[in-house]
Amino acid sequence: MKRNKVKIVKFLEVEELKEFEKPLYERAKEALEKETLSVPDKITLRDFVVVNLVYAGALRISEACNLELKDLDLQHKNVYVFNGKGGDRLVPLPESTIKLIEKWLEIRPEWKNNPYVFTNIKGTTKPGKIRPLNPKYFNQLFKKLANETGVKLRDGSLPHPHTLRHSRAMELYDNIGNLQLIQALLGHKNIATTQIYAQVRDEKVAEMQNTITGGLINL
């Protein structure tokens, strides 16, 4: 009889994520201290906001890239995800992320008929055609951050944008433990998909127990 193996969920702990994001954070902080922002400065700030939004909302990178202005409800600290992989959903965000989005909107390039929150800073790929950011762009950004920080996943592979979503789900499970709430936030159609995070954490606990020696007096 075959045992059901727990699906591998690649994630980083909170402190590892902070270390991974540190170079981007420092560049964004330096950019905000300038009176006039260059194009690279704006790109850095945009990337920093996207990364933090994806993590805070446990979004898929494609969902963040396709966000439109009409999807923002900053007053109530929410964003609406439409046509996501798991369907439409409401995503609550912390105050810190809302402030980052507001800061981005202050410097966001204004183009006629541009519905997207995040766009290419330098222009569009085709004249008169506004396109959202390409999610593949962030694959390259993550490779760069991984090379800068040396942060890797447990299996030795490099973090990628979806790592943020997995990492946020694990953090939420550790702090909340309510799989139904996490399922709603992640937009999972099936609770079994969400239960993977609980199984992964249970396996981590089991691994830890196996490495612990001592305790009470042995008989």
For each predicted feature, which ranges?
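Conserved catalytic core of the tyrosine transesterase superfamily
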Residues: 1-219
